[in-house]
Amino acid sequence: MVELEIFEKLPLGGTNIREVPKKLEAEAPALCEKLLKQQVKKLKPQGASLPEGHLVLLLGGSNGILRAVAIQLLFGEKIPVYAVHYDRRMMIGGHHVKAITDLAAARGVDTRWFNADATDPKVIDEAVAEIKKKYKVVHLINGIAAGATKRYKELGAINVPDLDVAYHPVLQYPDFSSSDNIRNFGLVAVPLADDADIEKTNKFMGSSTTLWAEPLAAAGLLARETSIVAFADYDFEKDDPVYGMGPLAGAKILQRESMAKVREKFGGKTIRLCYPAMDTTAIGAIPGGLIMFALSTQVLAEEGKFKNLMQLAEETMEIFKPGYTGNELRADADFQACLPEMHRREPYLTKENIQEHLHLLPKLELP
């Protein structure tokens, strides 16, 4: 294996953070509106259906895979969606939400978004009270991604291979539209987690489903054997030096345990939504995340099996089709199958040839 140089991975691909709020204010509204209309124009109904008085509630949804799910539900299936997201002034999410709510209002589809901490009891109570005014049954999808992308300190420090990729200056996702945006391939350091990191990750990604299930059930909105309670999961490899050996892994285990409790206590139809590595803002923050996405995507594209966020959202609609009885949706089946070939290629990657090894990515419709 070629010896790789260590480089520092910067937030948003090294974007000047001080300039972000000004750039978003100037360019994001029009760009988010344009992108949404382009995506909605291509939507095809997938046959998802919910009875009158039913609502889908998303934890997350302003960006990434749950944004795509929200778009498909609202504009492809005409299903009402409420969401609780948390976006600060320098994040693109709030602008995506504005575009979604404006278009939904124009098309007569009910949606409401709360920009607040989804683990705050006051926020939960407020949202539940608002939902109860109009709806009888809630279906919950938890997509909170707010964990520490670090290793347990007892496992020690490590460097892992990763990419330096330019981000879209406004939409804030790793931008593979040009090979020139792939600027470096080398090693990045994996930070070590402290107790506060572990506690925060467990709160947001481990127990947050239970925080909502209790008050929803108390309000009569979580219907036994009817309400779907799902969470967006990543089925990491057990030997993954970051995801498999830090707070993210621990939180995912807690999340799965909490889902079992929801099923036993409230009779919720619990479903694990397994997604592949995806081209999102969040994956860029995970050491090793970008090379995992890029190389697996290259392999999948060669096989004609790559799916972008909107295509994965279409697949997610399966859980809302009449008669669906599964407890796990494997939207990552092709991704999991491609991992051996991806790992076979890894030793041959260098800083000099990385663009060649990822030559199909600029031809794909990302994210």
Model-derived segments and spans:
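A short helix-coil junction within the Rossmann-fold of NAD(P)-dependent oxidoreductases
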Residues: 76, 133-135, 150-151, 214-224
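A glycine-rich helix->loop->beta "capping" turn
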Residues: 107-111, 127-156
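N-terminal Rossmann-fold NAD(P) dinucleotide-binding loop
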Residues: 66-67
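Rossmann-fold cofactor-recognition segment
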Residues: 101-123
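Catalytic loop of short-chain dehydrogenase/reductase
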Residues: 159-267, 274-292
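Acidic, Ser/Thr-rich peripheral helices and adjacent loops at domain boundaries
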Residues: 102-104, 290-304
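Non-catalytic terminal and boundary segments that flank Rossmann-like NAD(P)-dependent oxidoreductase
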Residues: 1-60, 71, 76-78, 88, ...
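Conserved glycine-rich Rossmann-like NAD(P)H-binding loop of the short-chain dehydrogenase/reductase
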Residues: 77-95
